[in-house]
Amino acid sequence: MSKADVVIVGAGHGGAQCAIALRQNGFEGTITVIGREPEYPYERPPLSKEYFAREKTFDRLYIRPPTFWAEKNIEFKLGTEVTKVDPKAHELTLSNGESYGYGKLVWATGGDPRRLSCQGADLTGIHAVRTREDCDTLMAEVDAGTKNIVVIGGGYIGLEAAAVLSKMGLKVTLLEALPRVLARVAGEDLSTFYQKEHVDHGVDLRTEVMVDSLVGENGKVTGVQLAGGEVIPAEGVIVGIGIVPAVGPLIAAGAAGANGVDVDEYCRTSLPDIYAIGDCAAFACDYAGGNVMRVESVQNANDMGTCVAKAICGDEKPYKAFPWFWSNQYDLKLQTAGINLGFDKTVIRGNPEERSFSVVYLKDGRVVALDCVNMVKDYVQGRKLVEAGATPDLEALADAGKPLKELL
């Protein structure tokens, strides 16, 4: 049976960063990374933006050149999944039937796109935007003449895909079940702004609509039927309704977790010698009032990966990384600092009509998060307000001419 001192399951951002950080921190043992996809680790965010828009080729998405991993003596088993974890034996069962031993295990599998459960969900022409294969398949259909696309889901993935497709000249309809887009992650001001932007760019954006079924001919999707009976023509459908944490084997092995796998302040699961990082890991977040939650971002995956690598190398410290996020749509750059969970007030800096403004989120008078649209200085200075738990004067906070650093 093959084995490694550290086995990392998942070859995304978190898994790659953990392997890199192990070597950077002097780890000399054996490292194996097991990845479901055939590619070496690559950046995910550009998939729904620059890669799909043909602004970046795939070789520019690699986190490190493929030759880097061999140079650092990091082994990869690509196109492979873990189907079973035996924590007592410190042994994995792989999708090819092979057994693989580990000293320490780092679970960095992220999540699988949530699928529609309605009639017609198994038709061809229905896509996620999670992997290179997802995007390549959709791009091939566009190249073959697809003109009408329906995007189901008004989160960041759906909005970013809609922006790219509309810029390419396709007819895009975006459907959101809730009263506004970004309802789970942003305040009403930001939602209203982005809804208007997409409508102004030609997207048929509809909120408070429910999908009843997908209709098709000869096994291929041709439309999306709404609960009221209307059928929206669609030669392709993109589904962006969230992810399901890919933690089945860990939970089956006895790991605690209801939404992903639970980890402590050191990213340790309830199973011995097993860590979890990234989108699949639920932890008590200091920047969300100690609420146990999963944070789906590249920043979180990378920082958790570094935290675990240092712990394995003997420098164990609690995970306290500051959360941040970004999204590019059209010519708009959104930068988010902090987590707005439970906010009770917002303050607007700047003018949304000028397409350059910030939304500051407060809870009990304390700044907990910012959404900054084309406001880089606010983002850089505002994150310090969040880190400090600042309680600024609201009138001064609303004055876009007053630098946020002066409110500390």
Curated annotation (Swiss-Prot):
Cofactor(s) this protein cannot do without: FAD
Binding site residues for FAD: G14, K49, V82, R130, D279, V298
EC identifiers of the protein: 1.18.1.3
Cellular-component GO terms for this entry: cytoplasm
Pfam families: Pyr_redox_2, Reductase_C
Chain coiled-coil ranges: none
Gene3D superfamilies, alphabetized: 3.30.390.30, FAD/NAD(P)-binding domain
Top enzyme class: oxidoreductase
Keyword line: FAD, Flavoprotein, NAD, Oxidoreductase
Any one GO molecular function term: ferredoxin-NAD+ reductase activity
Reaction it catalyzes: 2 reduced [2Fe-2S]-[ferredoxin] + NAD(+) + H(+) = 2 oxidized [2Fe-2S]-[ferredoxin] + NADH
InterPro entries membership: FAD-oxidoreductase/Apoptosis, FAD/NAD-bd_sf, FAD/NAD-binding_dom, FAD/NAD-linked_Rdtase_dimer_sf, Reductase_C
Subunit: Monomer. The dicamba O-demethylase multicomponent enzyme system is composed of an oxygenase component (DdmC) and an electron transfer component formed by a ferredoxin reductase (DdmA1) and a ferredoxin (DdmB). In vitro, dicamba O-demethylase assays in which DdmA2 is substituted for DdmA1 demonstrate that the two enzymes possess nearly identical activities.
PANTHER family according to UniProt: APOPTOSIS-INDUCING FACTOR 1, RIESKE DOMAIN-CONTAINING PROTEIN-RELATED
Record's function text: Component of the dicamba O-demethylase multicomponent enzyme system involved in the degradation of the herbicide dicamba. In vitro, catalyzes the transfers of electrons from ferredoxin (DdmB) to NADH. Both NADH and NADPH support enzyme activity, with NADH being markedly more effective than NADPH.
Recorded family membership: Belongs to the FAD-dependent oxidoreductase family.
Protein name (record): Dicamba O-demethylase 1, ferredoxin reductase component
Native organism: Stenotrophomonas maltophilia
